[in-house]
Amino acid sequence: MPWAWNLVDQLNSVLFSLRYGHKLKKFRFKTPHKNYQIIPICNIPTDALVKFFAHQPNEAYKFFRPHGFDPKSIQRLKENKAFLAYVLIEESSGHIVGYFFNRSFFHGKGFRGRMVDINYRGRGIGTMMNCLLNEVGFSIGLRLFETVNKNNEASYKSAISASKVKVIDKMANGDLYLEILII
């Protein structure tokens, strides 16, 4: 019943926009990020996002499966007002070096996710993107959460480096369900 989930997503998008849209219109990232541009995915061509995801190695998807990566799925996300997603673009090359999002809900929760391009790992970009997600999420009044697997060392370190966290649950698959706390 994918149509039912699509309907729920559309309803959530409308309700989220009614509740948080005015705050999002006023929001601007406070911290300038030298050498990078932060662009909402609605302003990025769908094929550029699909190409970014296709460029990542299979191991990048072992712990990262938040949505489909095909053109139709990406286009649907771009139209969803509750899916606060951005890319980080390196100014010198124009390359997308990271993708990050808060999957948000009208009742006030958001779930963080991010992916750093394979060629840009180990530079602190994941931690930077987490800080940006905190900035937008907390500024509009969301409670933020994340699931992260301790076996995914880079993502785990990024989550705890960027934020004060509270472990809500240790899940059977090894994931930790974290609440991101305002510092």
What are these regions (language model features)?
Residues 137-149:
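Conserved GNAT acetyl-CoA-binding A-motif
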Residues 103-112, 121, 173:
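A conserved beta-turn-beta hairpin within the catalytic core of GNAT-like acetyltransferases
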Residues 122-137, 157, 161:
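Conserved acetyl-CoA-binding loop-helix of GNAT-fold acetyltransferases
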Residues 59-109:
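Acetyl-CoA-dependent GNAT
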Residues 35-51:
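A short beta-loop-alpha structural element at the N-terminal edge
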Residues 113-123, 149:
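A short, internal acetyl-CoA/4′-phosphopantetheine-binding micro-motif in the GNAT/acyltransferase core
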Residues 170-183:
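C-terminal "cap" of GNAT-fold acetyltransferases
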Residues 150-169:
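Conserved active-site alpha-helix within GNAT-family acetyltransferase domains
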